[in-house]
UniProtKB/Swiss-Prot annotation:
The lineage of its organism: Bacteria, Bacillati, Bacillota, Clostridia, Eubacteriales. HAMAP family: HisZ (MF_00125). Belongs to the class-II aminoacyl-tRNA synthetase family. HisZ subfamily. It is found in: Cytoplasm. It comes from Clostridium botulinum (strain Okra / Type B1). InterPro entries: aa-tRNA-synth_II, aa-tRNA-synth_II/BPL/LPL, HisRS-like_core, HisRS/HisZ, HisZ. This is ATP phosphoribosyltransferase regulatory subunit. NCBIfam families: hisZ_biosyn_reg, PRK12292.1-3. One of its GO terms (cellular component) is cytoplasm. Keywords: Amino-acid biosynthesis, Cytoplasm, Histidine biosynthesis.
Length: 422
């Protein structure tokens, strides 16, 4: 029988050294953006009861969840998203809090990928949720925070596409169409397959207004700049659909007033499989990654499943895809802190240790050498990316080697500190 002790499960990944450092830097930067935008971080358990995610509007199908059992036979899951846990926490622990709540998180989620197409089963996510207000101000706040988060990472040439969940719902609510056909219709529209859409609409037996039919037929083409809104309005008299279009227009205008409209485009063909979102929906894209790197929107019906009715909006960033995009754009964020290796004669251990602690307090990465041979120390330092080797070999000045310039000097401690702070 084959042993699997040297393998990891499909969809999982070891993250090592440089890549790990980049991932942590990205997550730290996102945390700073959230913190200075007034969001408070929460941490939820990796394992939740299946019932947390078992509702008729859950965005994640149950077959996509990793399941296990506790000692009482109750079904548990590795959390497949963070929105439901935040809903649970809000409904059970935050009823007396001051609203609106501004929450943020950075966590791994887990989803089964049966297609084995290279997608991860463990996904690093980072995002925010604004809970307790249903005006467009909170939608704008969420979208603007998403834009600023991506900008803070140095990401180039990204776009946030805006849609509206209520728009498609308004166009189809009076159609007599089977559930499986509606699901197929949504898929065709998402794929922007105009030919297949026309054929599908001609074949199904439904009652719909001529205007709504024409608008649905044109949904794959209705994406681009803000002018798309007026084009769509000209194709329908559906009052609910027109209200949805007005919402998108007003959100866009607010973002335009802030000066961030260059990052926004409109996609009225953005539809969802399950009626999870209730208002504006948005996704972030960059050329270097095929899938969306960010997704979010308004979901006003979820938190009521946890004992309290509250509107909410937010987004989640896929940190793994952000890493791919930054790597391809050659804008990876690395630690710029200087790295120092200190070697010493045994009688100078205490002085070497004390100096190392002083350097650490100044945010200099520093370690004591575990090697004694000069050649081994030099080879280790070069492979590790050390900037300076410092040697405690006598009472007065210390040996200092700059590995970038290959220069050697003998300096006092204060002179070394000044050098490292440059």
């Amino acid at each position: 029988m084959e042993k699997w002790n040297k393998h990891i499960p499909e969809g999982m990944k070891d993250i090592l050294f440089k890549e790990s450092n980049i991932k942590l830097n990205i997550e730290d930067q996102l945390r700073k953006v959230y913190k200075y935008s007034g969001f408070s971080e929460i941490i939820s358990p990796t394992i939740e009861f299946y019932d947390v995610f078992n509702s008729n509007i859950q965005a994640i199908p149950q077959e996509k969840m990793y399941k296990l059992f506790d000692n009482l036979g109750r079904v548990l899951v590795l959390r497949p998203d963070m929105i439901a846990p935040i809903g649970r926490i809000t409904g059970t622990k935050m009823k007396e809090c001051t609203y609106p709540l501004r929450l943020c998180y950075t966590a791994n989620i887990f989803r089964v990928n049966e297609k084995l197409n290279g997608k991860r089963g463990e996904i690093a996510q980072s995002g925010i949720e604004i809970i307790g207000t249903n005006g467009i101000k909170s939608d704008v706040d969420s979208i603007v925070t998403a834009i600023n988060a991506l900008l803070s990472l140095g990401l180039k040439n990204f776009k946030i596409e805006l849609g509206e969940a209520g728009f498609f719902q308004a166009l189809t609510e009076n159609m007599e169409i089977k559930e499986e056909n509606l699901k197929k219709l949504k898929e065709i529209i998402r794929n922007k397959n105009y030919v297949a859409l026309k054929k599908f609409l001609d074949e199904i037996s439904s009652k719909y207004s001529k205007e709504d039919f024409e608008l649905i037929k044109n949904l794959p083409k209705l994406f681009g700049d803000i002018k798309i809104i007026e084009k769509a309005k000209a194709l329908t008299k559906n009052k609910k659909a027109l209200r949805s279009l007005d919402d998108i227009h007003n959100i866009y205008k607010s973002i335009e007033n802030i000066g961030l409209e260059a990052y926004i485009s409109i996609d009225l063909g953005m539809v969802q499989n399950i009626d999870y979102y209730t208002g504006v929906i948005f996704k972030g894209y960059v050329e270097e990654v095929g899938d969306s790197i960010l997704s979010g929107g308004r979901y006003d019906n979820l938190i009521q499943h946890f004992g309290i009715e509250l509107p909410a909006t937010g987004f989640a960033i896929n940190v793994d895809d952000i890493m791919i995009a930054l790597k391809k754009q050659n804008t990876m964020s690395m630690d710029k802190d200087k790295k120092v290796l200190i070697f010493y004669k045994e009688e100078f251990l205490r002085k070497a240790y004390d100096f190392m602690q002083e350097l650490k307090m100044k945010k200099i990465i520093c370690e004591l050498s575990l090697l004694d041979d000069d050649k081994e120390i030099l080879l280790y330092s070069k492979k590790k990316g050390i900037d300076f080797i410092i040697g405690f070999m006598g009472e007065e000045k210390l040996f200092v080697k700059d590995l970038k310039s290959d220069k050697i000097a003998f300096l006092k401690k204060d002179e070394i500190e000044n050098l490292l702070m440059l």
